[in-house]
C-alpha cells in the first residue's frame, strides 16, 4: 500500500506548543508595528493623492467632513503615534536598554497607553 504525500502530511502530529501558545505583549506589539508601518505607507500615499486632487477641485475638501473619513483619520493618527512610540522603544533597545522581561512588558504597555493619549490629545 502506497500512501500519497497528502495523506502522510494530514496524519502528521502537530507540535503541542502550537495549540497552547499564547501571544505575549512583545510579539503582539511587534506584529502591530509592522502592520502600522505598511498601513501608514498606504495612508500617506492616499493622503498625498487626496491633497493634490483637492488643489484642483474643492469638492475633495468637502469630502473630509464625512464621518467615515474622520474615523479613518483618527485611526491613521493612532497608527502614526503607535508607530512613533514603538519606534522610540526600539531605539532604546538599539542602545541596549530595556531588555529584561519586566521592562519589555512595562514599555510595551506604555507604548499602547501613550499612543492612545497622544491620539486623544490630537483629536479632542
UniProtKB/Swiss-Prot annotation:
Stretches assigned to the Cytoplasmic side: 1-29, 89-103
Protein's pathway: Carbohydrate metabolism; tricarboxylic acid cycle
SUPFAM superfamilies cross-referenced by the UniProt entry: Fumarate reductase respiratory complex transmembrane subunits
Pfam (any one): Sdh_cyt
The keyword Aminoacyl-tRNA synthetase is assigned to this record: no
Alphabetical list of InterPro entries matching this protein: SQR/QFR_C/D, Succ_DH_cyt_bsu_CS, Succ_DH_cytb556, SuccDH_FuR_B_TM-su
Gene designation: sdhC
Cofactor: binding details: The heme is bound between the two transmembrane subunits.
GO biological process: tricarboxylic acid cycle
Protein purpose: Membrane-anchoring subunit of succinate dehydrogenase (SDH).
Assembly mode: Part of an enzyme complex containing four subunits: a flavoprotein, an iron-sulfur protein, plus two membrane-anchoring proteins, SdhC and SdhD. The complex can form homotrimers.
Ranges facing Periplasmic side: 56-67
Positions contributing to heme binding: 83
Protein name: Succinate dehydrogenase cytochrome b556 subunit
Superkingdom, natural source: Bacteria
Cellular compartment(s): Cell inner membrane
Keyword annotations: Cell inner membrane, Cell membrane, Electron transport, Heme, Iron, Membrane, Metal-binding, Transmembrane, Transmembrane helix, Transport, Tricarboxylic acid cycle
Amino acid at each position: 500500500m502506497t500512501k500519497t504525500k497528502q495523506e502522510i502530511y494530514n496524519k502528521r502530529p502537530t507540535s503541542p506548543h502550537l495549540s497552547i501558545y499564547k501571544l505575549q505583549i512583545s510579539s503582539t506589539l511587534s506584529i502591530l508595528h509592522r502592520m502600522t508601518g505598511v498601513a501608514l505607507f498606504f495612508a500617506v500615499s492616499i493622503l498625498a493623492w487626496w491633497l493634490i486632487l483637492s488643489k484642483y477641485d474643492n469638492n475633495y475638501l468637502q469630502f473630509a467632513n464625512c464621518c467615515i473619513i474622520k474615523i479613518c483619520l483618527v485611526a491613521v493618527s493612532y497608527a502614526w503615534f503607535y508607530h512613533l512610540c514603538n519606534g522610540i522603544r526600539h531605539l532604546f533597545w538599539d542602545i541596549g536598554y530595556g531588555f529584561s522581561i519586566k521592562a519589555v512588558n512595562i514599555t510595551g504597555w506604555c507604548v499602547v497607553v501613550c499612543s492612545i493619549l497622544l491620539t486623544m490629545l490630537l483629536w479632542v
